């Protein structure tokens, strides 16, 4: 389950399911605390309330110890990138949603659902909606989330993650095949 590709339940939507080592409180901290969020996604505060600000300070080179080149089409992100969203749902240890304005310049929305499982495991369901239908955007966003989730799992399991761009490049190729065949 933890390496499966995301699925596209409807146009402009990507959904991932991952089984994570819990408990839910631990996963919630990785979603909402800047110092933990920075280890797998991006630094930035999350104001703990509906309507609260969510900061995204991306610097992909900080997500692993690996020094690797940034692909040419992402070179504009070399020194990092910043944007903000707003919390649209805040149900601690269960569900977090916020707006996301980076992919197309349009506002999309990300939802994380945490479902407790046996043996201190947590099923994470990540859904990103309102992405539009541009295949280039869908490929990039799908590969990005897939890569960030690989890094999250490594962090939760105490493993040093592989370089972001090496994984992302591979995932982009795979999602290009998947989306190109839709």
Regions found by a protein language model. Name each.
Residues 1-49, 53:
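Hydrophobic ligand-binding cavity/cleft-lining segments
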Residues 15, 35-80, 166-170:
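Short beta-edge strand/loop motif at the mouth of beta-sheet-based domains
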Residues 18, 44, 82-88, 109-116:
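Hydrophobic/aromatic beta-strand elements that line small-molecule binding cavities or substrate pockets
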Residues 24-25, 47-50, 88-94, 113-123:
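A short, structured loop/turn motif at beta-sheet edges
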Residues 27, 37, 54, 87, ...:
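Hydrophobic pocket/interface hotspot
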Residues 54-56, 71-74, 97-103, 126:
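Short beta-strand segments that buttress and anchor functional surface loops
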Residues 99-152:
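Beta-strand/loop substructures that line and gate deep hydrophobic ligand-binding cavities in soluble
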Residues 129-182:
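A conserved amphipathic terminal alpha-helix motif
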């Amino acid at each position: 389950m933890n390496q499966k590709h995301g699925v596209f339940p409807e146009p402009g939507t990507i959904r991932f399911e991952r089984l994570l080592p819990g408990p839910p409180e631990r996963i919630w901290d990785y979603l909402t605390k800047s110092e933990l969020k920075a280890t797998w996604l991006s630094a930035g505060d999350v104001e703990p309330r509906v309507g609260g600000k969510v900061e995204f300070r991306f610097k992909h080179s900080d997500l692993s110890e690996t020094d690797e080149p940034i692909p040419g089409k992402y070179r504009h992100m070399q020194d990092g990138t910043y944007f903000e969203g707003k919390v649209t749902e805040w149900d601690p240890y269960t569900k977090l949603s916020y707006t996301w304005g980076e992919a197309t310049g349009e506002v999309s929305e990300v939802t994380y659902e945490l479902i407790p499982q046996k043996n201190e495991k947590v099923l994470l369901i990540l859904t990103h909606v309102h992405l539009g239908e541009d295949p280039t955007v869908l490929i990039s966003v799908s590969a990005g989330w897939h890569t960030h989730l690989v890094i999250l799992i490594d962090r939760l399991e105490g493993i040093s993650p592989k370089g972001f761009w090496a994984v992302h490049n591979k995932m982009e190729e795979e999602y290009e095949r998947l989306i190109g065949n839709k």
